[in-house]
Design a protein with these regions (language model features):
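Domain-level signature for soluble enzymes in the chorismate/prephenate branch of the shikimate pathway
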Residues: 1-96
Length: 96
């Protein structure tokens, strides 16, 4: 392959990555819209942190990461951030 072809391929792959990033951001936005709905369904701050649910989510994403040949530690760290941000959001919205 020539250098020119490599540059074209690199640009194409980067564009593909950018498109995937855009989809990921949209999906994260969708996830947080659902968290807003959950917030409206919870009646008290005692309901914000569900340790059983958190454990289930983290085990689930870890398993899915392994099946997709992705480092599960990376995925768990990302989901821990999602969970922390959801807890912050719920804490700020739930009054009781």
């Amino acid at each position: 392959m020539t250098k020119k072809n490599n540059m074209y391929d690199l640009k194409k792959v980067r564009k593909d990555i950018d498109n995937i990033d855009n989809k990921i951001i949209e999906l994260i936005g969708d996830r947080f819209k659902e968290i807003h709905k959950v917030t409206k369904l919870k009646e008290s701050k005692d309901e914000i942190i569900d340790h059983e649910r958190i454990t289930h989510i983290l085990k689930s994403v870890q398993s899915k990461a392994k099946r997709n040949k992705i480092d599960p530690e990376i995925i768990v760290r990302i989901w821990q951030i999602f969970i922390q941000e959801a807890i912050k959001l719920e804490s700020s919205k739930i009054k009781k």
